[in-house]
Amino acid sequence: MIEIEKVCVDFTAGRGTPTRAVDNVSLHIAAGEIFGIVGTSGAGKSTLLRTLNALTRPSQGRVNVNGVEISALDGKALRQARQRIGMIFQHFNLMHTRTVAQNVAFSLKAAGWERSKIAPRVAEILTLVGLADKANRFPVQLSGGQKQRVGIARAIANHPDVLLCDEPTSALDLETSATILALLRQINAQLGITIVLITHEMNVIKSICDRVAVMSGGKVVESGEVFDVFAHPQHAFTQQLVSHTLNLTLPERLREHLPGQLLKILFIGDSAEQPVLSEVAIKFGVAVNILHGKIEYIGERALGILVVQLTAPHNPTAVAAAVEHIRQRTAQVEVIRG
Protein backbone atom coordinates (compact mmCIF):
# COMPACT_ATOMS: atom_id res chain seq x y z
CA MET A 1 0.00 0.00 0.00
CA ILE A 2 2.68 2.51 1.09
CA GLU A 3 6.30 1.79 0.28
CA ILE A 4 9.06 4.05 1.55
CA GLU A 5 12.37 3.00 0.01
CA LYS A 6 15.70 4.39 1.25
CA VAL A 7 14.30 7.88 1.72
CA CYS A 8 16.57 10.73 2.78
CA VAL A 9 15.51 14.35 3.25
CA ASP A 10 18.11 17.12 3.46
CA PHE A 11 17.49 20.76 4.32
CA THR A 12 19.95 23.51 3.48
CA ALA A 13 19.94 26.97 5.04
CA GLY A 14 21.65 29.43 2.71
CA ARG A 15 25.09 28.16 1.75
CA GLY A 16 25.52 26.08 4.87
CA THR A 17 26.04 22.36 5.16
CA PRO A 18 22.83 20.39 4.52
CA THR A 19 21.05 18.99 7.57
CA ARG A 20 19.73 15.46 7.15
CA ALA A 21 16.26 15.28 8.70
CA VAL A 22 15.40 11.79 7.42
CA ASP A 23 18.21 9.30 6.96
CA ASN A 24 17.81 6.24 4.72
CA VAL A 25 14.36 5.18 5.92
CA SER A 26 12.57 2.18 4.43
CA LEU A 27 9.10 1.14 5.58
CA HIS A 28 6.23 -0.88 4.14
CA ILE A 29 2.75 -0.02 5.43
CA ALA A 30 -0.07 -2.44 4.63
CA ALA A 31 -3.47 -1.37 3.36
CA GLY A 32 -6.01 -0.94 6.15
CA GLU A 33 -3.60 -0.87 9.08
CA ILE A 34 -2.96 1.85 11.63
CA PHE A 35 0.76 2.51 11.55
CA GLY A 36 2.46 4.70 14.12
CA ILE A 37 5.72 6.62 13.90
CA VAL A 38 7.03 7.71 17.30
CA GLY A 39 9.99 9.80 18.37
CA THR A 40 11.02 12.91 20.23
CA SER A 41 11.01 16.41 18.71
CA GLY A 42 13.52 16.63 15.88
CA ALA A 43 13.51 12.89 15.21
CA GLY A 44 12.34 13.44 11.61
CA LYS A 45 8.89 11.92 11.95
CA SER A 46 6.91 14.96 10.68
CA THR A 47 9.27 15.37 7.74
CA LEU A 48 8.88 11.69 6.87
CA LEU A 49 5.09 11.92 7.09
CA ARG A 50 5.04 14.87 4.70
CA THR A 51 6.87 12.84 2.06
CA LEU A 52 3.80 10.59 1.84
CA ASN A 53 1.78 13.33 0.14
CA ALA A 54 4.78 15.13 -1.39
CA LEU A 55 4.48 18.20 0.82
CA THR A 56 8.16 17.44 1.33
CA ARG A 57 10.21 15.91 -1.47
CA PRO A 58 12.81 13.24 -0.70
CA SER A 59 16.38 14.21 -1.50
CA GLN A 60 17.01 10.52 -2.18
CA GLY A 61 14.84 7.42 -2.40
CA ARG A 62 11.22 7.04 -3.42
CA VAL A 63 7.73 6.95 -1.92
CA ASN A 64 5.00 4.80 -3.49
CA VAL A 65 1.34 5.14 -2.47
CA ASN A 66 -1.16 2.76 -4.07
CA GLY A 67 1.46 1.70 -6.59
CA VAL A 68 2.15 5.28 -7.72
CA GLU A 69 5.50 6.94 -7.04
CA ILE A 70 4.06 10.08 -5.51
CA SER A 71 7.51 11.54 -4.96
CA ALA A 72 7.89 11.76 -8.76
CA LEU A 73 4.56 13.47 -9.49
CA ASP A 74 3.78 17.13 -10.02
CA GLY A 75 1.04 19.33 -11.43
CA LYS A 76 -2.33 17.76 -12.13
CA ALA A 77 -1.13 14.21 -11.45
CA LEU A 78 0.04 15.21 -7.97
CA ARG A 79 -3.21 17.04 -7.21
CA GLN A 80 -5.20 13.97 -8.21
CA ALA A 81 -3.02 11.69 -6.08
CA ARG A 82 -3.41 13.97 -3.06
CA GLN A 83 -7.18 13.68 -3.27
CA ARG A 84 -6.72 10.05 -2.16
CA ILE A 85 -4.62 11.11 0.84
CA GLY A 86 -6.26 13.04 3.69
CA MET A 87 -4.29 14.81 6.41
CA ILE A 88 -5.04 16.19 9.87
CA PHE A 89 -2.82 18.46 11.92
CA GLN A 90 -1.90 19.19 15.51
CA HIS A 91 -3.42 22.69 15.42
CA PHE A 92 -6.47 21.84 13.27
CA ASN A 93 -5.85 24.39 10.43
CA LEU A 94 -9.51 25.36 10.12
CA MET A 95 -10.84 28.42 8.30
CA HIS A 96 -12.18 30.55 11.13
CA THR A 97 -14.54 32.66 9.01
CA ARG A 98 -16.41 29.59 7.74
CA THR A 99 -18.82 27.32 9.55
CA VAL A 100 -18.14 23.68 10.32
CA ALA A 101 -20.16 22.60 7.28
CA GLN A 102 -18.41 25.14 5.06
CA ASN A 103 -14.99 23.94 6.22
CA VAL A 104 -15.86 20.40 5.15
CA ALA A 105 -17.56 21.52 1.94
CA PHE A 106 -14.47 23.48 0.93
CA SER A 107 -12.43 20.31 0.40
CA LEU A 108 -15.20 18.83 -1.74
CA LYS A 109 -15.46 21.95 -3.89
CA ALA A 110 -11.70 21.98 -4.34
CA ALA A 111 -11.88 18.37 -5.50
CA GLY A 112 -14.50 19.25 -8.14
CA TRP A 113 -17.57 17.60 -6.60
CA GLU A 114 -20.93 18.34 -8.22
CA ARG A 115 -22.75 21.05 -6.29
CA SER A 116 -25.81 18.87 -5.67
CA LYS A 117 -23.72 16.15 -3.99
CA ILE A 118 -21.78 18.35 -1.59
CA ALA A 119 -24.45 19.07 1.05
CA PRO A 120 -25.50 15.39 1.44
CA ARG A 121 -21.86 14.32 1.75
CA VAL A 122 -21.16 17.03 4.34
CA ALA A 123 -24.17 15.92 6.39
CA GLU A 124 -23.08 12.28 6.14
CA ILE A 125 -19.52 12.93 7.24
CA LEU A 126 -20.50 15.27 10.10
CA THR A 127 -22.78 12.55 11.43
CA LEU A 128 -19.91 10.08 11.28
CA VAL A 129 -17.62 12.31 13.36
CA GLY A 130 -20.36 13.26 15.84
CA LEU A 131 -20.85 16.88 14.77
CA ALA A 132 -24.23 16.79 13.02
CA ASP A 133 -25.57 19.35 15.51
CA LYS A 134 -22.60 21.68 15.04
CA ALA A 135 -22.84 22.18 11.26
CA ASN A 136 -23.60 25.91 11.51
CA ARG A 137 -21.14 26.72 14.30
CA PHE A 138 -17.90 28.59 13.71
CA PRO A 139 -14.55 27.20 14.91
CA VAL A 140 -14.34 29.80 17.70
CA GLN A 141 -17.48 28.23 19.19
CA LEU A 142 -15.96 24.74 19.36
CA SER A 143 -13.81 22.91 21.87
CA GLY A 144 -10.39 21.60 20.88
CA GLY A 145 -11.73 18.09 20.43
CA GLN A 146 -14.59 19.33 18.25
CA LYS A 147 -12.15 21.31 16.10
CA GLN A 148 -10.10 18.17 15.53
CA ARG A 149 -13.28 16.31 14.56
CA VAL A 150 -13.89 18.98 11.92
CA GLY A 151 -10.34 18.44 10.70
CA ILE A 152 -10.95 14.71 10.48
CA ALA A 153 -14.26 15.23 8.66
CA ARG A 154 -12.59 17.50 6.12
CA ALA A 155 -9.73 15.04 5.63
CA ILE A 156 -11.96 12.02 4.92
CA ALA A 157 -14.70 13.79 2.97
CA ASN A 158 -13.17 12.84 -0.41
CA HIS A 159 -13.13 9.09 0.37
CA PRO A 160 -9.34 8.89 0.74
CA ASP A 161 -7.45 5.62 0.92
CA VAL A 162 -4.91 7.04 3.37
CA LEU A 163 -5.23 9.38 6.35
CA LEU A 164 -2.05 11.07 7.61
CA CYS A 165 -2.22 12.24 11.23
CA ASP A 166 0.40 14.75 12.38
CA GLU A 167 0.38 14.73 16.21
CA PRO A 168 -3.45 14.68 16.24
CA THR A 169 -3.84 14.64 20.03
CA SER A 170 -0.87 16.63 21.33
CA ALA A 171 -2.91 19.83 21.75
CA LEU A 172 -5.71 18.02 23.60
CA ASP A 173 -6.30 16.90 27.19
CA LEU A 174 -6.15 13.20 28.04
CA GLU A 175 -9.91 12.58 28.01
CA THR A 176 -10.43 14.38 24.70
CA SER A 177 -7.41 12.63 23.21
CA ALA A 178 -8.96 9.27 24.04
CA THR A 179 -12.18 10.19 22.21
CA ILE A 180 -10.25 11.34 19.11
CA LEU A 181 -8.24 8.11 19.05
CA ALA A 182 -11.47 6.12 19.41
CA LEU A 183 -12.90 8.02 16.43
CA LEU A 184 -9.82 7.24 14.35
CA ARG A 185 -10.14 3.54 15.25
CA GLN A 186 -13.81 3.67 14.22
CA ILE A 187 -12.96 5.30 10.88
CA ASN A 188 -10.27 2.71 10.22
CA ALA A 189 -12.61 -0.19 11.01
CA GLN A 190 -15.68 1.23 9.28
CA LEU A 191 -14.10 2.73 6.16
CA GLY A 192 -10.93 0.66 5.83
CA ILE A 193 -8.77 3.77 5.55
CA THR A 194 -5.06 3.22 6.11
CA ILE A 195 -3.91 5.52 8.92
CA VAL A 196 -0.34 6.72 9.39
CA LEU A 197 0.01 8.56 12.67
CA ILE A 198 2.99 10.35 14.18
CA THR A 199 3.33 11.15 17.86
CA HIS A 200 5.87 11.61 20.63
CA GLU A 201 3.68 9.61 23.04
CA MET A 202 4.03 5.84 23.35
CA ASN A 203 0.63 5.78 25.08
CA VAL A 204 -0.96 6.91 21.81
CA ILE A 205 0.87 4.16 19.94
CA LYS A 206 -0.21 1.59 22.52
CA SER A 207 -3.86 2.56 22.37
CA ILE A 208 -4.46 2.70 18.61
CA CYS A 209 -1.67 1.35 16.39
CA ASP A 210 -1.14 -2.09 14.87
CA ARG A 211 2.54 -1.55 14.11
CA VAL A 212 5.07 1.12 14.96
CA ALA A 213 8.36 2.55 13.77
CA VAL A 214 10.59 4.26 16.32
CA MET A 215 12.63 7.21 14.99
CA SER A 216 15.70 8.84 16.48
CA GLY A 217 18.12 11.18 14.76
CA GLY A 218 16.33 10.84 11.43
CA LYS A 219 16.63 7.04 11.39
CA VAL A 220 14.16 4.25 12.09
CA VAL A 221 15.92 2.46 14.93
CA GLU A 222 13.25 -0.19 15.50
CA SER A 223 9.93 -1.29 14.04
CA GLY A 224 7.41 -4.07 14.48
CA GLU A 225 4.10 -5.07 16.02
CA VAL A 226 3.20 -2.70 18.84
CA PHE A 227 2.90 -5.50 21.38
CA ASP A 228 6.31 -6.91 20.46
CA VAL A 229 7.99 -3.51 20.67
CA PHE A 230 6.54 -2.96 24.14
CA ALA A 231 7.31 -6.49 25.32
CA HIS A 232 10.82 -6.79 23.85
CA PRO A 233 12.27 -3.37 22.95
CA GLN A 234 15.65 -3.91 21.28
CA HIS A 235 17.16 -0.46 20.80
CA ALA A 236 18.27 1.59 23.80
CA PHE A 237 16.10 4.54 22.71
CA THR A 238 13.03 2.30 22.43
CA GLN A 239 13.76 0.82 25.84
CA GLN A 240 13.87 4.33 27.25
CA LEU A 241 10.52 5.25 25.66
CA VAL A 242 8.84 2.07 26.89
CA SER A 243 10.28 2.39 30.40
CA HIS A 244 9.09 5.99 30.62
CA THR A 245 5.62 5.00 29.40
CA LEU A 246 5.27 2.11 31.84
CA ASN A 247 6.84 4.27 34.58
CA LEU A 248 8.58 1.46 36.47
CA THR A 249 11.56 3.33 37.87
CA LEU A 250 12.25 2.61 41.53
CA PRO A 251 13.47 5.33 43.87
CA GLU A 252 17.21 5.03 44.49
CA ARG A 253 16.59 4.55 48.21
CA LEU A 254 14.73 1.30 47.57
CA ARG A 255 17.26 0.04 45.05
CA GLU A 256 20.15 0.57 47.46
CA HIS A 257 18.80 -0.38 50.87
CA LEU A 258 16.20 -3.14 50.53
CA PRO A 259 17.55 -6.60 51.41
CA GLY A 260 17.31 -9.65 49.17
CA GLN A 261 17.02 -9.74 45.40
CA LEU A 262 15.16 -7.18 43.30
CA LEU A 263 13.68 -8.51 40.06
CA LYS A 264 11.84 -6.96 37.13
CA ILE A 265 9.52 -9.61 35.72
CA LEU A 266 7.77 -9.52 32.35
CA PHE A 267 4.52 -11.46 31.99
CA ILE A 268 3.01 -11.97 28.54
CA GLY A 269 -0.40 -13.36 27.63
CA ASP A 270 -1.71 -16.09 29.92
CA SER A 271 1.26 -15.85 32.28
CA ALA A 272 0.06 -12.37 33.28
CA GLU A 273 -3.02 -14.00 34.77
CA GLN A 274 -1.27 -16.87 36.62
CA PRO A 275 -0.38 -16.84 40.37
CA VAL A 276 3.35 -17.27 39.72
CA LEU A 277 4.49 -15.26 42.73
CA SER A 278 2.12 -17.08 45.07
CA GLU A 279 3.57 -20.35 43.80
CA VAL A 280 7.16 -19.40 44.62
CA ALA A 281 6.20 -18.09 48.05
CA ILE A 282 4.56 -21.40 48.93
CA LYS A 283 6.94 -23.78 47.14
CA PHE A 284 10.25 -22.20 48.15
CA GLY A 285 9.35 -20.41 51.36
CA VAL A 286 10.50 -17.00 50.16
CA ALA A 287 8.92 -13.70 51.07
CA VAL A 288 7.64 -11.84 48.01
CA ASN A 289 7.16 -8.09 48.21
CA ILE A 290 5.66 -6.34 45.16
CA LEU A 291 7.27 -2.92 44.92
CA HIS A 292 5.88 -1.70 41.62
CA GLY A 293 3.89 -3.03 38.70
CA LYS A 294 1.03 -2.90 36.25
CA ILE A 295 -0.75 -4.95 33.63
CA GLU A 296 -1.40 -3.29 30.28
CA TYR A 297 -3.68 -4.63 27.56
CA ILE A 298 -2.35 -3.91 24.08
CA GLY A 299 -5.09 -4.92 21.72
CA GLU A 300 -6.40 -8.04 23.44
CA ARG A 301 -3.02 -9.24 24.72
CA ALA A 302 -1.92 -8.79 28.31
CA LEU A 303 1.50 -7.38 29.14
CA GLY A 304 2.40 -7.35 32.82
CA ILE A 305 5.53 -5.94 34.44
CA LEU A 306 6.29 -6.29 38.13
CA VAL A 307 9.22 -5.20 40.25
CA VAL A 308 9.49 -7.52 43.25
CA GLN A 309 11.73 -8.16 46.24
CA LEU A 310 12.54 -11.77 47.19
CA THR A 311 13.96 -12.58 50.61
CA ALA A 312 14.70 -15.77 52.54
CA PRO A 313 17.17 -14.83 55.31
CA HIS A 314 17.51 -18.36 56.68
CA ASN A 315 17.67 -20.16 53.33
CA PRO A 316 19.66 -18.19 50.70
CA THR A 317 19.49 -21.00 48.13
CA ALA A 318 15.69 -20.75 48.14
CA VAL A 319 15.86 -17.33 46.48
CA ALA A 320 17.98 -18.67 43.60
CA ALA A 321 15.56 -21.57 43.13
CA ALA A 322 12.60 -19.19 43.20
CA VAL A 323 14.21 -16.96 40.57
CA GLU A 324 14.76 -19.96 38.30
CA HIS A 325 11.12 -21.02 38.74
CA ILE A 326 9.96 -17.52 37.81
CA ARG A 327 12.20 -17.59 34.71
CA GLN A 328 10.52 -20.80 33.56
CA ARG A 329 6.99 -19.44 34.07
CA THR A 330 7.36 -15.93 32.67
CA ALA A 331 8.65 -14.21 29.54
CA GLN A 332 11.64 -12.41 31.00
CA VAL A 333 13.35 -11.84 34.34
CA GLU A 334 15.89 -9.08 34.94
CA VAL A 335 17.86 -9.07 38.19
CA ILE A 336 17.96 -5.42 39.20
CA ARG A 337 20.04 -6.10 42.28
CA GLY A 338 21.10 -9.11 44.29
From Swiss-Prot:
It holds the Pfam family NIL. Disulfide bonds: none annotated. One of its GO terms (cellular component) is plasma membrane. Its EC number is 7.4.2.11. It catalyses: L-methionine(out) + ATP + H2O = L-methionine(in) + ADP + phosphate + H(+); D-methionine(out) + ATP + H2O = D-methionine(in) + ADP + phosphate + H(+). Residues 2-242 form the ABC transporter domain. It comes from the Bacteria. The keyword Kinase does not apply. The complex is composed of two ATP-binding proteins (MetN), two transmembrane proteins (MetI) and a solute-binding protein (MetQ). This is Methionine import ATP-binding protein MetN 2. It comes from Salmonella paratyphi A (strain ATCC 9150 / SARB42).
